[in-house]
Amino acid sequence: MTLRQNKVAIRLGNFVFHGDDFGVIIKRDETIVGDVWTFMSLSSGDITMLREHQLTPYTRRKNGTVPAENMSDKQRRAIGLIEQNLQINWNGRTMEDVSTFIGLFKEASLMVTRKQRQRSYDQYAGLDGFD
């Protein structure tokens, strides 16, 4: 049996299908047998570890859905910051995907920003005008 190779690379943060189940990739582990992806189902919330050949990239939006290109500048900036802070990749196609992505990753992105700010302030801790 020949394994089907995905033409589109799967990356952390991507929406993907596992069979008929739609979800998001939340972790990648490099193992001696290849990459193992942690998949979170958006319908049930179940988390499953899968090999890449068990996943199908999300490449097209369903007919009748509003395209992600209609997102506001504020949403576009939020997605860009989330990608930058968490080192993940956006591949959504619809406005529902925009909402889901921001809802899933916004808090984690804000925590990264807070930690970075705190570290920059910590270097001044204990200093006074005479140090």
Language-model features, listed with the residues they occupy:
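Mixed-charge, Lys/Arg-rich low-complexity intrinsically disordered regions
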Residues: 1-12
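A charge-rich, low-complexity, intrinsically flexible signal that marks solvent-exposed coils, linkers
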Residues: 62-131
